[in-house]
Amino acid sequence: MGAAYHILGKTVYPHQLAIGTIVSVVGGIVIASSGKKAEKPAAPAIQAGSSDEEKFIANFLKEQEAAEKK
């Protein structure tokens, strides 16, 4: 059947090496990309003493987000 490699005393054909390589690479990618995904922690609620303070904090955060987008 053509050329073959002798690895650890066994005859291994080139197509078997190719299939083994493809399976190993795809299997590694699947294993690496699977698993538990870490959830992003939610932002804590605003702890304001009064409604005016809460409005000030909310307005400040909106301004900062707008400045970051620019």
Swiss-Prot record:
<keyword id="KW-1133">Transmembrane helix</keyword>
<dbReference type="InterPro" id="IPR021278">
    <property type="entry name" value="ATP19"/>
</dbReference>
<dbReference type="GO" id="GO:0045259">
    <property type="term" value="C:proton-transporting ATP synthase complex"/>
</dbReference>
<comment type="similarity">
    <text>Belongs to the ATP19 family.</text>
</comment>
<protein>
    <recommendedName>
        <fullName>ATP synthase subunit K, mitochondrial</fullName>
    </recommendedName>
</protein>
<keyword id="KW-0472">Membrane</keyword>
<comment type="subunit">
    <text>F-type ATP synthases have 2 components, the catalytic core F(1) and the membrane-embedded component F(0), linked together by a central stalk and a peripheral stalk. The central stalk, also called rotor shaft, is often seen as part of F(1). The peripheral stalk is seen as part of F(0). F(0) contains the membrane channel next to the rotor. F-type ATP synthases form dimers but each monomer functions independently in ATP generation.</text>
</comment>
<comment type="function">
    <text>Mitochondrial membrane ATP synthase (F(1)F(0) ATP synthase or Complex V) produces ATP from ADP in the presence of a proton gradient across the membrane which is generated by electron transport complexes of the respiratory chain. F-type ATP synthases consist of two structural domains, F(1) - containing the extramembraneous catalytic core, and F(0) - containing the membrane proton channel, linked together by a central stalk and a peripheral stalk.</text>
</comment>
<keyword id="KW-0813">Transport</keyword>
<keyword id="KW-0066">ATP synthesis</keyword>
<keyword id="KW-0496">Mitochondrion</keyword>
<keyword id="KW-0138">CF(0)</keyword>
<keyword id="KW-0375">Hydrogen ion transport</keyword>
<keyword id="KW-0406">Ion transport</keyword>
<dbReference type="GO" id="GO:0065003">
    <property type="term" value="P:protein-containing complex assembly"/>
</dbReference>
<dbReference type="Pfam" id="PF11022">
    <property type="entry name" value="ATP19"/>
</dbReference>
<dbReference type="GO" id="GO:1902600">
    <property type="term" value="P:proton transmembrane transport"/>
</dbReference>
<dbReference type="GO" id="GO:0005743">
    <property type="term" value="C:mitochondrial inner membrane"/>
</dbReference>
<dbReference type="GO" id="GO:0015986">
    <property type="term" value="P:proton motive force-driven ATP synthesis"/>
</dbReference>
<feature type="transmembrane region" description="Helical">
    <location>
        <begin position="15"/>
        <end position="32"/>
    </location>
</feature>
<keyword id="KW-0812">Transmembrane</keyword>
<keyword id="KW-0999">Mitochondrion inner membrane</keyword>
